[in-house]
Amino acid sequence: MKEEVFDIAVVGGGIVGSATFYQLQKAFPTKKLVLIEKEPKLAHHQTGNNSGVIHWGLYFTPGSKKAENCVKGRHELVNFAKEHGINHDICGKVVVATSSSEISNLEKILDNGIQNNIEGIERINADQIKEIEPEVAGVDGIWVPCTGIIDFVGVAEKMIQVAIGTNSSSKVYTSTKVVNIEQNEDE
C-alpha cells in the first residue's frame, strides 16, 4: 500500500466507527478522513449480527450522558433512516415481568423511561401483554410504542457512502489491519 496522509483516522467499521466517520466528515467537510476495517466488509461483527433494536433509554440512569445520548441519538437515527430509505420499523416493545418478584425491577425501568422522556411509555397488565404479544406470558409489563428495529448494516454502509460523497478524498480500507500509529510531532 502506498503511503497516504490523512487528517483523521477512524479504526473499526462497525456502527460506532461508521457513525464516527460520518459525523466527523459532516463536521469537517474539508478534512481528509480514513476508516480502516480489518474485516473484508463493514459491519461484519456485532453490528451485522445483533437484533437491530433501536434503544430508547429504558435502562440508562436518568440525567446520565448515556441517557442523554440515547435520547438524542434515537431521533437522529430514525431521521437518517427515513431520509436515506433504510429499512426500519417502529414496531414497539414489551418489557415483561414473568413473576411478581420482578415487578420492582419493572417499576425501576418504567421510572427510567418516564424520566428519560420516552414517548408513549405505559404500564400494562397481563391481558394487555397477551393482546400485544399473544405468545408472551407475563404478570405485568411495560409497553414502549416508540421502540423499533433497524438495519444497522444498512445504516453503517449509508453513513460511509454519504461521508465519502461529502469529500471524495476520504477513504475506506477494508481487509486492512492497523499495526502501528504514529503522530507527527510537527503538526
Language-model region placement:
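Beta1/beta-strand and adjacent pyrophosphate-binding region of the FAD-binding site
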Residues: 2-16, 34
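Conserved Rossmann-like nucleotide-cofactor binding loop
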Residues: 16, 20, 41
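Gly/Ala-rich phosphate-binding loop of Rossmann-like dinucleotide-binding domains
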Residues: 21, 25, 162
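Glycine-rich FAD pyrophosphate-binding loop
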Residues: 25-49
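Short loop/edge segments at beta-strand edges and connector loops
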Residues: 37, 90, 124-126, 174-176, ...
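Dinucleotide-binding Rossmann-like beta1-alpha1 core, especially the glycine-rich loop
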Residues: 52-132, 138
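Helical element adjacent to the flavin cofactor pocket in flavoenzyme catalytic cores
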Residues: 142-187
